[in-house]
């Protein structure tokens, strides 16, 4: 692929991630639409096509773009327009559905069974309201993800707090392993 085509395709991928599918890429945008470059690169690196993308590539992508679609400031990036879903993820405590789902690679299962779900490089653990969404997120990490089911009722009884993310995503600080099961569906 020639360089111009590479940067055009990268711009489309970054736009999709920042404007329309933060939930799929597990990105946490602030109230002004900014996300850390580190978090975006981590999400992009889940795909073989974007595994080698570096901050320098994002800078070149922005410079070469005819239309200014993205802005890079310090170690944060944002899309300048065209968002189809709300940008702000407000940490507002809420009562989630009885079960939430998390898609991940089978290689992480032993650690999750021992230690539960933790946010890793993010601020929160991301959980989906439905299995399909969890599977889409999980497929960014593994072609054949496992879907974990979180019993939110029992977790809330033990003090786990859940926060509203957006229409598809709930957030939590962490989920202890006793509230997690493998979804068999």
Swiss-Prot record:
Gene3D superfamilies, per database record: 3.20.170.30, RNA 2'-phosphotransferase, Tpt1/KptA family, N-terminal domain
EC number: 2.7.1.-
Coiled coil: none
Any one of the GO BP annotations: tRNA splicing, via endonucleolytic cleavage and ligation
GO MF term set: NAD+ poly-ADP-ribosyltransferase activity; tRNA 2'-phosphotransferase activity
Record key words, sorted: NAD, Transferase
Enzyme class: transferase
Keyword NAD tagged: yes
Keyword Amino-acid biosynthesis: no
InterPro entries associated with the record: Ptrans_KptA/Tpt1, RNA_2'-PTrans_C, RNA_2'-PTrans_KptA, RNA_2'-PTrans_N
Family: Belongs to the KptA/TPT1 family.
Role according to the record: Removes the 2'-phosphate from RNA via an intermediate in which the phosphate is ADP-ribosylated by NAD followed by a presumed transesterification to release the RNA and generate ADP-ribose 1''-2''-cyclic phosphate (APPR>P). May function as an ADP-ribosylase.
PANTHER family for this protein: PUTATIVE PHOSPHOTRANSFERASE (PTHR12684), TRNA 2'-PHOSPHOTRANSFERASE 1 (PTHR12684:SF2)
Protein name: Probable RNA 2'-phosphotransferase
Gene coding for it: kptA
